[in-house]
Design a protein with these regions (language model features):
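A short, amphipathic edge element
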Residues: 19-20, 51-52, 128-140, 189-194
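N-terminal mature ectodomain segment of secretory-pathway/periplasmic proteins
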Residues: 14-102, 139
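Short, solvent-exposed mixed-charge patches
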Residues: 250-251
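Gly/Pro-enriched, hydrophobic low-complexity segments
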Residues: 74, 85-87, 95-99, 105-109, ...
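N-terminal signal peptide c-region/cleavage motif recognized by signal peptidases
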Residues: 8-10
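A short, surface-exposed loop/turn module that caps and links secondary-structure elements
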Residues: 142-145
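Sec-dependent N-terminal signal peptides
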Residues: 1-5
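Sequence-level motif detector for i,i+2 pairs with an aromatic at +2
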Residues: 32-36, 66-68, 133-135, 149-151, ...
Length: 251
């Protein structure tokens, strides 16, 4: 689909099959508990100039609700100590807070600002939420090959009225139900961004994680690449490690 093309829902779209595939995607990724990742964020502008940041992402699986995540920036110096806390929810809007050391205060991200850029990257705050079935309505579109991989193609429409997207087009590999690519369409229905998932590795003999996630903004020419350099599961994290009042002391 070319840039600026508008979303057209195919006549043969199958909502029931779309939901069934999405449910299977969710089911195969349950039970991992918690994880800690070390990551590099590479920001590149339209001219190709780049800058990098080092960060850690702590995640906690939550029964009967969305997952919790804590991102802590370690480098460079101007962002060191910045911490972002995300409490995902299945249906209602996520709770999100950002601690900025220079201001020595915790800022709540309002629902209306979830479509804004996270730390100057091409990822929006809403992109950092965990995948939850209640956040979307689903349509199965077709089977397709992408870079030699057999995939299901789904359209998922956000249920949150404050979402910056009218629709996301998702390619899931048919063997493991892993996302291969996602296209994001803006509020006017035009293609905004494409997210690509690469270098998958399996953990605990079940859970797949992409070690490279590349977000390309087609409207600005900017891109952000998240590369995971280390990842550990079941490290013993608890709910108390994901509280707003601990953001200023996040380590």
């Amino acid at each position: 689909m070319t840039i600026g093309a508008f979303v057209a829902f195919p006549a043969l779209a199958d909502p029931a099959k779309g939901l069934e595939i999405a449910e299977q995607r969710k089911a195969v990724d349950m039970g991992w508990g918690d994880s800690v990742a070390t990551m590099e964020m590479l920001l590149r502008n339209k001219q190709g100039e780049s800058s990098s940041r080092l960060m850690r992402l702590k995640s906690l699986e939550v029964d009967d609700d969305g997952d919790k995540g804590l991102t802590i920036f370690d480098e460079p110096r101007d962002v060191k100590g910045t911490a972002f806390l995300n409490h995902s929810h299945i249906t209602k809007s996520d709770d999100q807070w950002l601690y900025l050391p220079a201001l020595k205060r915790v800022k709540r991200i309002s629902s209306r600002n979830k479509s804004g850029p996270f730390m100057g990257s091409e990822f929006a705050y809403e992109d950092l939420s965990s995948f939850e079935l209640g956040k979307y309505t689903f349509n199965y579109i077709e089977d397709a090959k992408i870079e030699g991989v057999d995939t299901f193609v789904l359209e998922q429409v956000p249920t949150d009225k404050n979402s910056g997207y009218t629709m996301q087009k998702v390619w899931l590999d048919q063997q493991f139900y892993r996302p291969v690519q996602v296209e994001f369409y803006d509020r006017k229905g035009a293609l905004l961004k494409t997210l690509s998932f690469e270098d998958y590795k399996q953990y605990l003999n079940q859970y797949w994680r992409a070690h490279t996630m590349s977000m390309q903004n087609h409207q600005t020419g900017k891109s952000t690449v998240l590369t995971t350099t280390d990842l550990a599961f079941q490290t013993g994290l608890k709910d108390k490690d994901f509280q707003k009042n601990t953001l200023k002391r996040a380590k």
